[in-house]
Amino acid sequence: LSHSSAASDVYKRQASGFGQTGPLKELPAYDMVVQGMGGLMSVTGHPNSEPTRVGTSIGDITAGLFTAIGINAALYDRQKTGKGAFIDVSMLDCQIAILENAIARYLSKNEIPEPMGSRHPSIAPFEAFKTKDSFLIIAAGNDKLFKSLCEVLEIPNIANDEMYKTNSLRSQNIDKLKLIIEDKLQHKNTDEWIKVMENLKIPCGPIFNIKQAVENPQIKERNMIVKSFHKKIGEFKSAGNPINCLLYTSPSPR
């Protein structure tokens, strides 16, 4: 459907599995279907593992988000031009859109990405590392952060080592580097390492389960767990609105 298919002063929107055009336009879809067809499951999980679904309904959620963005863009355009629009959002298209890194690697290098666990394909160290008691996410996204990390781990010589002194070199030699890092991390618990790393502004964090995530003081401070009310079941708690507008409070959905 074209722009002119909408009335001159209104907009219409359609979010569907495969959109309003193309050979699949009449077919139904669920989140799981587009995760598979969009390539997302092919890069999720660990090497040689079975196809792995992302832990949330990302196919549904991204389609909703892109639809909301499209509606806002159409309203803004109507305000300026007086013209309406038809917004066509495909769940499958949204999966392609969010795989920007993987698709860029294929289109530019003819490289077909594979699952890498928690590892990043082009930044290192940028993954989960085992500590004395659990796992720790470390995201040393540039050379400066890597030098700070080496200071914390008391391996300053590694920062200037010919195998690790640049991000490109670290990515090439990440298996060896991970062994060095985890050897040092074994001496303290995750919480202890986080305190030290946060002092140097090294991006890091624990891996929480849902209970720990919900009870995180940061989440409570941000009003991300709210009380709601339903006429049949009464009061209940749910996830809040991540969009904070400082001019308004965030009321519970009713």
Task: Give names to the regions the model predicted.
Residues 1-7, 11, 248-254:
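Single conserved hydrophobic/aromatic residue that forms the stacking wall/gate
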Residues 125-200, 204, 250:
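Aromatic-enriched alpha-helical interface/lid elements that frame and gate functional surfaces
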Residues 106-113, 216-230:
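Short, surface-exposed loop/helix-turn segments at secondary-structure junctions
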Residues 233-250:
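Flexible, small-/acidic-enriched active-site or ligand-binding loops
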Residues 32, 227-231, 235-238:
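Glycine-rich phosphate-binding loop and adjacent beta-alpha segment
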Residues 8, 13-136, 140:
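Active-site-adjacent "lid/gating" segments in soluble enzymes
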Residues 198-219:
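Conserved PLP cofactor-binding pocket of PLP-dependent enzymes
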Residues 127-131, 226-231:
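Short acidic-hydrophobic surface loop/beta-edge motif
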